[in-house]
Each structure stands twice: as C-alpha cells, then as structure tokens.
Regions:
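A detector for small-residue-rich transmembrane helices and their helix-helix packing motifs
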Residues: 2-208
Length: 208
C-alpha cells in the first residue's frame, strides 16, 4: 500500500519530469502562457489597448511596425476560441518542438503567423485575431510528417477526418452566425503540409 513517504519520494521525480518537459518545449510553453496572459488582460479592462497595439497593420503608417505581422496571433476573442487553439498548439506544437528543436519550431510559428495573416488580410482585411493559422500549420506539418514517416507522432485515430471536418465547418460557419478565418486556416494548413514534406525529404536523419 502506498504511504505518505512514497508520495514525498515521488514528488521530486515528478518535478524533474515536468522540468524536462518544459525545457524540451520552451517555445510552446512561452507562447501558450503569453496567449493566456493576454486573454486575461483583455478581460480585465485592457482589450482596447491590446487590440490597438497588436492588430494586423490596417493603415499605411502601421506597415513599418513589424511586430503586428505576428502579434495578431496572440489575441483571442472568446473562451472557446482560445481553448481550441491552445489545446491543439500545446499537444502537437509541443510534439514538433520536442522532436525537431525549439529553433525549428519557432521558425515554423513565425512564418505561419506571417503567411496566414497576410492571406487572411488579402481576403477580408485586417480585422482578424487568433493562433488558428499557426495551429493549422502545426496540424498540417504533423499530418504529412507522420504519413511519410509513420509513428513520428502519436496521432489519435481519425486525425485526418478531424482536420477535414474542422476545415469544412469553417465554410459553413457563416450560416450559423459564426465567422471563422478560413483563409488563415487553409493557408496555414498548406504551409504546414509543404514545410513538413520538405523537412521529411531534406533532413532524413531526424527520422532515423
């Protein structure tokens, strides 16, 4: 029967495991925490200030404010919005970072935020927010890498079907009064597929 002393003995080991996990996915942890803090601040009276500072460039004088091409991704507008994005980002983004390293993952995050934002802006203008363009890039990346190198990631059964349903829902969501950034989702997903394919072909040693 486990005793109190067993629990005390296990605690340091659990802390070591947690420390190793966070160390192996630093970017995932930092961005997840940043999105959560930003969302909290939005809900305690700072939403207007945050949106003004971080939205995608809307005016010519904002084009030189380089951070705006990325920071639109850390703003979320509802609880379901942030929970969906951060859940998938933590699960699959963390898997990519642990496998391929923080620098590679950070590059994927930054490029997908910039590309999905530019595409969404082209179709709808600058009024969009959220990490979903990055999340779909992460999901596309994981999908193609696991197809080319089976069991690279521990994907749940029906993963591909889930992605298709998510993308299709985006197209019919306006019928239910829900506006979703389809252009960001699709462009992020395509970017992730291409990136994962190239990664699989160029850096074979990572999969051996």
């Amino acid at each position: 029967m486990p005793s109190l002393f067993d629990s005390e003995t296990d605690a340091p080991e659990e802390r070591k495991v947690l420390k190793r996990t966070l160390s192996a996915q630093k970017i995932t942890f930092i961005l997840t925490a940043l999105c959560a803090v930003i969302y909290f601040l939005q809900n305690v009276g700072f939403e207007e200030l945050i949106v003004d500072l971080f939205h995608y460039p809307a005016y010519s004088w904002e084009d030189q404010e380089i951070w705006r091409y990325f920071t639109h991704a850390i703003i979320h507008l509802s609880v379901p919005h942030i929970l969906f994005n951060l859940s998938w980002f933590w699960l699959f983004g963390g898997a990519i970072e642990r496998r391929f390293g923080s620098f590679h993952f950070l590059l994927l995050v930054l490029v997908s935020a910039a590309v999905s934002g530019a595409v969404q802006n082209y179709f709808t203008g600058p009024a969009f927010f959220g990490l979903s363009g990055v999340v779909y890039a992460v999901l596309g990346y994981v999908l193609v890498v696991d197809k080319l190198h089976p069991h690279s990631f521990d994907l749940p059964e029906g993963f591909f079907t889930m992605l298709l349903v998510g993308l299709l829902f985006g197209f019919i969501s306006p019928l239910f009064g829900i506006n979703i950034g389809n252009a960001a989702h699709i462009s992020g997903f395509i970017l992730g597929l291409v990136w994962g394919f190239l990664q699989s072909k160029i850096n074979i040693k990572k999969f051996s």
